[in-house]
Regions:
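Helix-start/capping segments and mature chain N-termini
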Residues: 1-85, 89-96, 119-352
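Short, acidic/charged, Gly/Pro-enriched secondary-structure junctions
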Residues: 90-108, 112-119
Length: 352
């Protein structure tokens, strides 16, 4: 079993600042009641966003921030949650949060919109909606040295049960069952099938197979999250490797005969798979395509490829430009009622 990095925790620093209901407050003052609807029923939706530190430029770059918040808005629409900010405003809030925490290391951001009433009863309508966001240092979420995977006995929930195109908090118990099964059986990660027995995705990652000179991946109709890293990899494969990606139904046994397999996700980044169900994939080591994409991705997210800078939002630039269409304005004196000044904190200069 390959070594899996330890899980990050918000408590790694005592001076963390979070965003809650329009204000930036100390993390230890952010409280949610024990009867909160979302805590009992999973009635919330979230995003996972990464920011990468470039020590040469002393700059922190948020990767594809606008696209993440556009997806969050879509998730909120499905969940009947009123999120009263535009995606561009949400990017501004994120940048301000990172500035206030003065991160000089790779980090992970978790925006979360949820049903906040403290009541008993299963419904989505006529409830109060709240929004929060926090950030924490984060290196590798799962190993990138080569994963051993298990095809899970737990099937991916269907769109007419809990829609996978929305990042719904309650839906992730499905992933937790699958991931725990894999870990308890000596593997690193789970691969989940649909109810029909087709390949869907990992516990929290999209999946790609390399077969000959093409990549294949399950289509959205196979109950996958339409991942932003997935979209990134498809574009990079086309532009940089001259490889097309075909979206199609994939049978379980195709996993065993693939030349390469890798998982993609904001947390996972690009994680090669070297074994599935005790069968070596390809030569049993990280493959050429996966390795090339990992290297390319690592440079892009740290601002080392100028042609992809439109995907990045710099945090410490005085005039940062949010990715793909944001007006780039960031309020330095707080947003939505907060007037707290930024506190300078000690730098940590680690790169994953």
């Amino acid at each position: 079993m390959s070594k899996t990095p330890s899980n990050p925790a918000l408590s790694q620093r005592s001076d963390m600042v979070v965003f809650l209901n329009g204000e930036y407050i100390p993390a230890d003052q952010a409280r949610v009641g024990i009867a909160t609807h979302a805590l009992s029923y999973g009635t919330g939706c979230f995003e996972g966003i990464r920011a990468y530190y470039n020590s040469e430029r002393d700059q922190l770059y948020v990767f594809r921030a606008l696209e993440h918040f556009q997806r969050l808005k879509r998730s909120c629409k499905i969940m009947n949650i009123d999120l009263p900010y535009t995606p561009e405003e949400l990017v501004e809030q994120l940048v301000e949060l990172l500035r206030r925490n003065d991160f000089h290391e790779n980090c992970y951001i978790r925006p979360f919109a949820y049903k906040s009433d403290e009541i008993i009863g299963v419904k989505l309508n006529d409830l109060t909606d709240h929004y929060t966001m926090f950030a924490m240092p984060m290196g590798d979420y799962i190993s990138t040295a080569g994963l051993r995977c298990l095809v899970s006995s737990w099937r991916r929930v269907d769109d007419n049960m809990i829609p996978a195109r929305a990042k719904i908090s309650g839906a992730y118990v499905n992933s937790a069952f699958a991931k725990s099964e894999a870990l308890m059986n000596g593997c690193d990660e789970a691969i989940m099938l649909t109810a029909e027995g087709h390949v869907s995705e990992g516990s929290a990652e999209n999946i790609f197979l390399v077969v000959g000179n093409e990549m294949i991946t399950p289509p959205p109709s196979e109950n996958i999250l339409q991942g932003i890293t997935r979209d990134t990899v498809m574009e990079l494969a086309r532009r940089e490797l001259e490889m097309l990606t075909r979206e199609r139904v994939i049978d379980r046994t195709e996993l065993y005969t693939a030349d390469e397999i890798f998982l993609t996700g904001t947390g996972a980044q690009i994680a090669p798979v070297v074994e599935v169900d005790h069968r070596s994939i390809g030569t049993g080591v990280v493959g050429k395509v996966g390795g090339s994409l990992m290297s390319l991705y690592g440079d892009i997210v740290r601002g080392r490829r100028e042609e992809y800078m439109h995907w990045l939002t710099p945090v410490f630039d005085k005039k940062p430009a949010a990715s793909n269409g944001s007006n780039g304005h960031v309020a330095s004196n707080g947003l939505n009622g907060s007037n707290g000044a930024k506190t300078k904190r000690g730098k940590q200069t680690t790169e994953a």
